[in-house]
Amino acid sequence: MKTLLTLIAIVLAVASAPAADKAGTNTFCVQLIRGTEENKPPGAGNKPIDDRLDKSLHRVFKTKTFWEVQRRTVVLQDSTKAQVALNGKRAVEIDLSVPGKRRVATFENGKLLSRAIRPAGQAMTVVGGDADEKNVWFIVVRRDVPP
């Protein structure tokens, strides 16, 4: 029974993984997320985040609602890095120069805020900070593209 459950979990994980890019090509979805205590979007064009990300963030943070402020797609070759500007103040750098690792650095007004190093696989990287007492922001780097 335990073996069957393990096999089912593996099949579900593979089935839910995004399709692989061409060899050496890596596509990432970068999202700028804002968390608020309001039920209405904090800005024009902001939309609720997808259910998967919402559940992940609500497991950790008590913020009432999370909004996608901006979304960008980044295509990188292995062993390269790129910096993506978001909303004029924030930026993220995705660095694939170390084989098997994905380094993500966040910047605000050109100043380094944080750096995270993760395996280069399919998992998402979430980094962020406080906007003020009632608002938080996150930059999410993920391989899957939400609806």
Feature map (PLM): residue ranges:
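Bacterial N-terminal signal peptides
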Residues: 6-14
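Positively charged n-region of N-terminal signal peptides that target proteins for export
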Residues: 1-4
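Glycine-rich phosphate- or other oxyanion-binding loops that anchor nucleotides, phosphorylated ligands
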Residues: 17
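Outer membrane pore-forming secretion/assembly proteins and partners of Gram-negative envelopes
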Residues: 20-147
